[in-house]
């Protein structure tokens, strides 16, 4: 009896080894730039592995399912230094038979990387760039967008402000290009949902030290003066992606008004305070592995890697074209702890997703808001809809 039992164990080990030997390797690249952008708040400094940590967690999740399907997922990081060419880096990953690349790159670098590997069948997953043009006039057939767009973020915020009847906005815009792009999305959202921008002001970045010993005293004097003599408004909306001034606005405006946009009530794809729809277990797993909270970029990278894992499991394939065809099709969806399964817009390859509205400690609300209807999906009330798109996938 003992001999039979030992023999059975031996056969089991051999069978397991055979399965492992025959498993299909699915390599995923992670392409991003070195360094992190400093923030005004010391408690919000991004980690060196921001985004990458989310992708690593998703690889674990993919392999949990993959072991039953003879699929094994790996992640290969490629960190670009200043001056490194994103196109060459993407090509180098493709040379190593990596068919999927999660990219956290600026818009122009992302396009160069996508074009460099387009004819090789490599699919990029945009985890970081929120530029609408990447899904519109500059869209690519081999780029799937897990990150939301500026217009989706602006629409999610606008829906809540309108639902609250805070329809009169004072818009304060930074002087950098990305600030102007966010302001453009906010103007579009206001017009779309019935809000009115009663006044716009520009906050010029004059340079200088971002933190000084006299900072609190100086800012306490500057911000009330900057925001005084405004027409009647319900909420101050800030467009400051460069993070020059917006964090200084709450509690410092001349009139006692709430702040939203780049500070105060902030639209985002994920927040450390998200605890609904099973998110607590995700937050706890991430915290245990990384000794920090999960950011929006972490979640976007996690979602991108999970999209690959879901498509591989459903098609039982590792072929990039087969997975891309499935992702574009009507049967694809992915769960992401947001109350509903997420699907892909087939006209520009943007992932539909709810937008969280958070104040730094709690998730205040989740858009789309009640009453904002759509004939296909209420998620399509966020961002550019099919009739509006300029995308011609090529």
Language-model segments: residues:
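Extracytosolic ligand-binding ectodomains
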Residues: 2-8, 19-394
């Amino acid at each position: 009896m003992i001999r039979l039992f030992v023999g059975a164990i031996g056969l089991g080990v051999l069978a397991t080894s055979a399965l492992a030997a025959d498993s299909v390797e699915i390599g995923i690249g992670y392409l991003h730039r070195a360094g992190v952008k400093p923030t005004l708040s010391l408690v919000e400094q991004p980690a060196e592995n921001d985004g990458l940590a989310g992708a690593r967690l998703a690889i674990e999740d993919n392999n949990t399912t993959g072991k039953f399907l003879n699929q094994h997922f790996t992640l290969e990081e490629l960190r670009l230094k200043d001056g490194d060419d994103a196109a060459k880096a993407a090509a180098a990953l493709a040379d190593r038979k990596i068919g999927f690349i999660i990219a956290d790159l600026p818009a122009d670098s992302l396009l160069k990387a996508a074009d460099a590997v387009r004819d090789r069948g490599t699919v990029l997953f945009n985890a970081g760039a929120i530029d609408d043009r990447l899904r519109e006039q500059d869209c690519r057939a081999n780029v799937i967008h897990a990150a939301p767009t500026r217009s989706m973020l602006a629409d999610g915020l606008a829906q809540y402000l309108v639902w609250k009847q805070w329809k009169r906005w004072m818009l304060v815009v930074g002087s950098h290009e990305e600030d102007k792009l966010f302001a453009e999305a906010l103007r579009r959202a206001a017009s779309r949902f019935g809000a009115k921008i009663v006044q716009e002001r520009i906050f010029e970045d004059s340079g200088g030290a971002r933190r000084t010993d006299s900072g609190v005293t100086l800012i306490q004097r500057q911000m009330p003066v900057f925001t005084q003599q405004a027409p009647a408004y319900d909420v101050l909306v800030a467009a400051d992606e460069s993070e020059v001034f917006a964090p200084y606005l709450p509690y410092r405006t001349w009139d006692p008004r709430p702040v939203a946009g780049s500070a105060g009530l902030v639209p985002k794809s994920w927040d450390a305070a998200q605890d609904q729809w099973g998110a607590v277990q995700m937050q706890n797993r991430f915290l245990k592995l990384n000794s920090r909270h999960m950011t929006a970029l972490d979640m976007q990278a996690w979602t991108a890697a999970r999209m690959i894992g879901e498509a591989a499991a459903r098609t039982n394939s590792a072929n990039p074209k087969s997975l891309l065809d499935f992702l574009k099709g009507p049967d694809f969806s992915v769960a992401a702890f947001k109350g509903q399964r997420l699907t892909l817009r087939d006209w520009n390859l943007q992932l539909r997703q709810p937008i969280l509205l958070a104040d730094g400690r709690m998730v205040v609300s989740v858009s789309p808001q009640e009453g904002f209807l759509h004939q296909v999906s209420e998620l399509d009330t966020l961002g550019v809809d099919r009739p509006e798109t300029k995308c011609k996938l090529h």
